[in-house]
């Protein structure tokens, strides 16, 4: 079984590789290759000179939210060669909200539809996407998100303690901040918390956003490859994490946000970092408040209260840390993703 996973640039950060392709496709293929000698794969950017050669070699072409004319041309070649085409979706790619840097992709919906029409199978990451698309695309299959926990636990064995001697919080965000009405409340809560707890720092991984200058306690690190990011989470030995996302109060972006995935919970759980999460549906579906995370409304008092609670309660942090890890290991392991993708590959071979 030979697979060509087409890489692309991020829709929300110009000039950098897509994290969706890495987390959703190549990580799963790497796991499948690690556990089975029957799977071989190659991944190349869509503009690479060797893409045509990779198509000749492969049995199957996998795309992930691609929208370029170049991707269409490659898919058309794959179709003529008799190759099977799988198109993966993990967001509502048919329209981006105004807060998103991906809103510039809204004029490429016809390109996406062209690629979907060329595809033998369309895979989606969650039940919400499945329900919204199944009537239009009957060739739809669910391939859930998952974490290759053991891959990163090998590194965790080198870490001597769960928390650094210097208390640190981690915040990860691709694109702009995914909140509208509650954004000022979040930033106010952070400013008050860090003014009271000047021994704490906030490590940020992701794309720059306009409000960074107002957060002098924030240490910015640009987005990095998925493997490197996971290693940074483990080596960071963070006290806890924050994950803001607009919920019911953000009417314009609610439908889009409901189609997102709780990958940050999966990442933090696998890295044993306890987290505070907005009470958005993607997190209320996997986080039990006070058990494997904290859930907060997107207002000033809720965010500040959760920050103070986790900062002051070591036993709660340890409880959440262990429960989240166990939950990800049991319910969100990459083996479920691999099993689902293998079924799709075998059906489309």
Residue spans for each PLM region:
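Membrane-proximal helix-turn-helix segments that form the acceptor-binding/catalytic region
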Residues: 56, 76-77, 103-122
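Carbohydrate-associated surface elements
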Residues: 128, 146
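Conserved acidic donor-binding segment of nucleotide-sugar-dependent glycosyltransferases
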Residues: 262, 287-290, 294-300, 309-315
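A charged, aromatic-enriched C-terminal amphipathic alpha-helix characteristic of glycosyltransferases
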Residues: 20, 298, 315-346
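Nucleotide-sugar-dependent
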Residues: 178-181, 227, 231-270, 276-287
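N-terminal pre-catalytic "stem/leader" segment of glycosyltransferase-like enzymes
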Residues: 1-65, 71
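Active-site proximal beta-strand in glycosyltransferases
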Residues: 78-95
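Conserved catalytic-core segment of nucleotide-activated headgroup transferases in glycan assembly
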Residues: 7-28, 148-236
